[in-house]
Amino acid sequence: MDQNSYRRRSSPIRTTTGGSKSVNFSELLQMKYLSSGTMKLTRTFTTCLIVFSVLVAFSMIFHQHPSDSNRIMGFAEARVLDAGVFPNVTNINSDKLLGGLLASGFDEDSCLSRYQSVHYRKPSPYKPSSYLISKLRNYEKLHKRCGPGTESYKKALKQLDQEHIDGDGECKYVVWISFSGLGNRILSLASVFLYALLTDRVLLVDRGKDMDDLFCEPFLGMSWLLPLDFPMTDQFDGLNQESSRCYGYMVKNQVIDTEGTLSHLYLHLVHDYGDHDKMFFCEGDQTFIGKVPWLIVKTDNYFVPSLWLIPGFDDELNKLFPQKATVFHHLGRYLFHPTNQVWGLVTRYYEAYLSHADEKIGIQVRVFDEDPGPFQHVMDQISSCTQKEKLLPEVDTLVERSRHVNTPKHKAVLVTSLNAGYAENLKSMYWEYPTSTGEIIGVHQPSQEGYQQTEKKMHNGKALAEMYLLSLTDNLVTSAWSTFGYVAQGLGGLKPWILYRPENRTTPDPSCGRAMSMEPCFHSPPFYDCKAKTGIDTGTLVPHVRHCEDISWGLKLV
């Protein structure tokens, strides 16, 4: 029987005798089983085809994304992006210890940012020296041996009640007082930590209003926070240049007893410090200061550049930082890990607004004016700088001439400012007119607090998150004089374009310039030749310490 003849029929098969060939019951039953078998065969073939397709797809996926036990698939508070989905997030298998800068062994869940931040930025071209890595590991051992609660700490604490001490103790300390705005605090704390490394001291951090809410513990096995029962804590606010244990005051009034060793000294290194306070940066004075077991420091300065001008520190600094303009880049990434709450602010915003962009541009706007703004001359300055430096495209006001690009480049612009007007101005410009290049520009601003609120925890949490977000951009524009911008450029290893400070509310010409290095500026350096005991331009003594681009009298490493 021709089976195909039954499949080819277009008219129904009838069992009656009229009009069509009659078919008996046995033939009809045979046709039914043949049809049923054909349908089963078709379904089986289709199922196999689907299964094969799925297996091929899985094979391709796992070939592109090899399994890795160190890969972080996700987390509740601040999810790490999948590098296969978001190409602007660096390789998930990147070096989470930052070339040995960070120590292993921390509880990762207690501080997500410590090891996960590497996934959100490009690998740094600046590698820490083996000497710096060794120095940090040795410091961690010292901190664990001498930190709060240890027998050595308890023994040293008893010395505070004495006027003078006999002999050298096992451990010496430098206490950093929490003082000034967040940017200043971060920079000054990094400076004091470097001083601790150079002098084999243990750094203890006054938590102030919010230091423990903002930053994780950086040292394994021992807190860096000054205990709440430290006997001098209630004196911190009152310490100034006229305090009896202020080193500058003692030098000025010639009351230093060189025969004995003082139990403690107060070092006033705030921007308003005097010439006698600045003697701290003289090698002879460091010899005396180095014997004192307890140093209490109040500063709002990034005084690292002047440490390089102290001959006794020069060799050690050169070994620690062969690339001299990497000091804050390395120490900042070592010390300052945002707490999980702050890290959540960073990652949620990054994922929502920045992760899909082909290029990320950061613009940090700080206006030192009594009026809140926004100011037209500042908006003009931002546009002039970003367009002349080819960071952002110009707009074409003749819409009919706008370029059509099949796959336009997407740039995400992150604006941080106390005022919303500057971001809104950019957003409106790139919404109302097409770009001359066909690029798509998205403008985003996480917060607009209106004015600086130094003592508010949430304000500082947002500020830290924004500094960190700026550090994750590909290119950065910062404002002159701003420590906020200094922190971002240092953490990100970025040489920013600096918006020069306007005068008389007029847009500067040129509007901005490229920084010599990513290092912060020391705003209030000493101008004193310790040997000649006379004034001198300290920005011309060595080739790697120069005057800053944004503050002519400031010093920075280059």
From Swiss-Prot:
Q: Which GO terms describe its molecular function?
A: fucosyltransferase activity; galactoside 2-alpha-L-fucosyltransferase activity; protein homodimerization activity
What EC class is this? transferase
Provide the E.C. number(s) assigned to this enzyme.
2.4.1.-
* Glycan attachment residues as annotated in the record: 88, 504
Q: Tell me a GO cellular component.
A: Golgi cisterna membrane
Highest taxon of the lineage: Eukaryota
Q: Where in the cell is it found?
A: Golgi apparatus, Golgi stack membrane; Golgi apparatus membrane
Q: In which tissues is it expressed?
A: Expressed in roots, stems, leaves, flowers, siliques and seedlings.
- What residue ranges lie in the Cytoplasmic compartment? 1-43
Q: How does it sit in the membrane?
A: Single-pass type II membrane protein
Enumerate the Gene Ontology biological process terms. cell wall biogenesis; cell wall organization; xyloglucan biosynthetic process
UniProt KW Ribosomal protein keyword: no
Q: Which residues lie on this side of the membrane: Lumenal?
A: 65-558
Q: Which family does it belong to?
A: Belongs to the glycosyltransferase 37 family.
The record's function comment reads: Involved in cell wall biosynthesis. Is both necessary and sufficient for the addition of the terminal fucosyl residue on xyloglucan side chains, but is not involved in the fucosylation of other cell wall components. Associates with other xyloglucan-synthesizing enzymes to form multiprotein complexes for xyloglucan synthesis in the Golgi.
Q: How does it assemble?
A: Homodimer. Interacts with MUR3, XLT2, XXT2 and XXT5.
Q: What's this protein's name?
A: Galactoside 2-alpha-L-fucosyltransferase
Which organism's genome codes for this protein?
Arabidopsis thaliana (Mouse-ear cress)
Gene that this polypeptide is encoded by: FUT1
